[in-house]
Amino acid sequence: MTKKNAVSVNQLTKIYAKNSLNSVVALNELNLEVKEGEIFGLLGPNGAGKTTFINILSGTVIKTKGSVNVWGFDVDKNPRQVRASIGIVPQEVNLDAFFSPRKLLELQAGLYGVPKKNRITDTILKMVSLEKQAESYSRSLSGGMKRRLLIAKAMVHQPPILVLDEPTAGVDVELRKNLWENVKNLNKQGVTIILTTHYLFEAQEMSDRIAILNKGNLVALDTTKNLLNRIKTKKIIFKVNKLINLTKKKISGLFFSSNSNNEIMITYERNKHKIEDIINIIKNEGVEIIDISTEDGNLEDVFIQLTKN
């Protein structure tokens, strides 16, 4: 069965103009689709247009031209249906310090017009692992719990699409891991996830497909696997018995560096060199190789390659 598009964007353009001579193109004829049930990563450096895109989805920014459909509804013609179809989790943690998670969710559900008989507050608290803290003041929650409470607030009207805008900013590694486990569980229950993050490793691990924006333009849109296959270089690290300087060595397709731990790092182009040949280069320098390890490129390498200009 073919899945429908959760979000469809066609020729989306947003221009912020102070006057005819002073304008900024935040989004330039953007075309993309987010498929139902996927985790979709939206990446880009600061000023790439990510926040503008999310604000257009949420209805807080008016586009200049183009079309945007959310769950089959046009953002201009059906704004109420669009807002009912999407939940936005903002970057900033903004919670009433003296309200409990249960009270905050009940208030949020009321703002969305959800009848009391249709509210699923307890279910949502369990989904984000906050059922034990349901009656605690929100000020007493840890940073990770507050982030999960923001997700819970975005879910009170049971939207099929959840947008996470930098959800792990300022969260430590353990809490970040716990947060992503909750997001994955929501996705398994059928929620379509759109996420922005500056932690590229997270995007690589979490996303089914990734779009990369740069200066308002879409520079890549593909599966995570296909994006990683764009990397043409690989790194090999040698632990040797004494430090040698190879940085002045000029060999086409090889790039040398070293550190004070007697390690030599060589980045090489896969289609030009074999590992055996690189090992022989090190041996010919008269050193003993103690250990060898390799590193494949990651999403950060792709990101830098696509946005460096």
Briefly describe each language-model feature range.
Residues 2-9, 15-29, 79:
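A short, flexible loop at the N-terminus of ABC-type nucleotide-binding domains that lies
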Residues 158:
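Conserved catalytic motifs of ABC-family nucleotide-binding domains
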Residues 162-165:
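Catalytic Walker B motif of ABC-type/P-loop ATPase nucleotide-binding domains
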Residues 180-269:
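ABC transporter nucleotide-binding domain
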Residues 137-141:
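Conserved ABC ATPase signature
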Residues 235-309:
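Short, charged/small-residue-rich alpha-helical element at the C-terminal edge
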Residues 106, 110-133:
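Conserved ABC ATPase "signature" region
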